[in-house]
Amino acid sequence: MSVTVEVADEETHDVPLVEQVRTTPDQNVDVKVQENNVVTTKIGPKLETIPAAKMQDDNGDEEKAENSEGAAAEKVEKQHDDDGVVVHEETDGVASSRSSHHDKQKPGETKKSGDGKMDDDDIITTARSSSRRICGSAASSSDSETADDAPLLPDEGPSHAVRLEMPGDKPASPHDRFPKTPLKTLVAFLMLVVAAAGNTITLSWIHERYPLTPPLPDIVFELIPKIPWGLRLCENLMIGSFVSLLVLILFHRHRWIVLRRLCFIGSILYGMRCITMMVTPVPKADEDFECSPRFGENATFSLIVMRGVWSMFGLGLNLFDNQKVVLCGDYIYSGHTLVLVVSALFIGEYSPRRFYILHWLSWLVCSVGVIFLVLSHGHYTIDVILSYFACTRVFWAYHTQAAHPSIRLSVQNHQAKEFWFPLLRWFEGDIRRPVPRRFDCPISYSQVCNAFRRVRPRGRNGAARPAFE
């Protein structure tokens, strides 16, 4: 359907009307149907009902209607003047005209020329075509927020292309192939080593400062009697869970990425633990636990650092106390719970979904280890709770950002305010989607054959002997 609009001159102060097929009483429009298949709309002071003229039958001459449409369009193009510019557009077969005139007219108002009569410029000629639904203006009575023809978005600014990342999509570029980037993994591993060393050095310093007072009140300590062997059981479960995680990473197809994330998240958690231990030293949770003697007045910075580095080789566990360095005061928050929870989170995230038994088993081991840790008075209950929340918040926040670049690159991402977010963007800059849960052998069969292949003996002159003589 083609629609043309005539622009009135400045003397009559007429304003071109926005094209609209739907006629409503609010706009006070009269419609006349002519015999030449052209609908003429005239603006009047009131709504008049005029019977329709003769309509062409189905066997009429279609060429005559097309010629009349073309003539009407050419007529409007020749009548534009300097006060208004008519722009003809056509979208999906519908022609429209827009004017740059700045005057506006309210719906229902009618303007007249100097002699009080209607001008010919107030007539809008539109060509009738097949029934078609076009969105009306804001003055239309059918326009509302729930109307079917209401626009979905307001046309207030330039549109922006949005790309939706689908998990099942095939890689669209080489960046989606999960590069190994061992350099980034090495950087994350060094960060973990620095954080672990800082933990032990901080613990060595706290060992000289923690208060020698009775344990703080704890509801679990009051209700349940102490289980002395609970701490050793917790550490055994912790070692088994962490070794299982390392085996999972070893056989994961994207082992470099998983190992890098483990080291980076571990460095964040151990770094925050250094701060919490330092700011609030608390007394021992177990009065019967024997700690190494303090330096006292002979304490120096070098002695404290060397003792912390030496205790790091024991991994902070009581199972490896052959060096006779047992430090106390590392309570807020629990490092044992940190290892148990992080191991369970990584096993559940990167193992196949159908291995639900493994997922339940990992969380069962974590729960049992944490329970016996508290029952043995190895940690306060608040230490375990804070450690769980710290581990889960950091893990879930990191993996949400890493798996969805649209969130990571958004300007409205509030998690970008985290202190570790710039490092996340560098570590995960080449990751465009979630890491798939796929596995393979780290050493291929051909590599094994090449390693154990029989080397041909060489002669005296250095030339290789034939395989068969």
UniProtKB/Swiss-Prot annotation:
What catalytic activity is recorded? an N-acylsphing-4-enine + a 1,2-diacyl-sn-glycero-3-phosphocholine = a sphingomyelin + a 1,2-diacyl-sn-glycerol; an N-acyl-15-methylhexadecasphing-4-enine + a 1,2-diacyl-sn-glycero-3-phosphocholine = an N-acyl-15-methylhexadecasphing-4-enine-1-phosphocholine + a 1,2-diacyl-sn-glycerol
Compositional bias (Basic and acidic residues) spans? 72-91, 100-117, 162-177
- Compartment(s) where it occurs, according to its Swiss-Prot or TrEMBL record: Golgi apparatus membrane
* Organism of this sequence: Caenorhabditis elegans
Spell out the protein name for this chain.
Phosphatidylcholine:ceramide cholinephosphotransferase 1
Which spans are transmembrane here?
Answer: 186-206, 231-251, 262-282, 300-320, 327-347, 355-375
Active site per the UniProt annotation: 336, 379, 383
**What is this organism's lineage?**
Eukaryota, Metazoa, Ecdysozoa, Nematoda, Chromadorea
**Per UniProt, what is the membrane topology?**
Multi-pass membrane protein
What pathway does the annotation place this protein in? Lipid metabolism; sphingolipid metabolism
Gene Ontology cellular component list: endoplasmic reticulum membrane; Golgi membrane; plasma membrane
Cytoplasmic domain ranges by topology:
376-469
Question: EC number(s) on record?
Answer: 2.7.8.27
Keywords linked to the UniProt accession? Golgi apparatus, Lipid metabolism, Membrane, Sphingolipid metabolism, Transferase, Transmembrane, Transmembrane helix
Q: Which Pfam families match?
A: PAP2_C
Q: Where is this region: Disordered?
A: 40-177
Q: What does this protein do?
A: Sphingomyelin synthases (SM synthase or SMS) synthesize the sphingolipid sphingomyelin (SM) through transfer of the phosphatidyl head group of 1,2-diacyl-sn-glycero-3-phosphocholine (phosphatidylcholine, PC) on to the primary hydroxyl of ceramide (N-acylsphingoid base), yielding 1,2-diacyl-sn-glycerol (diacylglycerol, DAG) as a side product. Functions as a bidirectional lipid cholinephosphotransferases capable of converting PC and ceramide to SM and DAG and vice versa depending on the respective levels of ceramide and DAG as phosphocholine acceptors, respectively.
Q: Which GO terms describe its biological process?
A: ceramide biosynthetic process; sphingomyelin biosynthetic process
**Which Gene Ontology terms cover its molecular function?**
ceramide cholinephosphotransferase activity; sphingomyelin synthase activity
User: Per UniProt, what is the name of the gene that codes for the protein in this document?
Assistant: sms-1
Among PANTHER family, the record links this protein to: PHOSPHATIDYLCHOLINE:CERAMIDE CHOLINEPHOSPHOTRANSFERASE 1 (PTHR21290:SF27), SPHINGOMYELIN SYNTHETASE (PTHR21290)
Q: Which family does the entry's similarity section mention?
A: Belongs to the sphingomyelin synthase family.
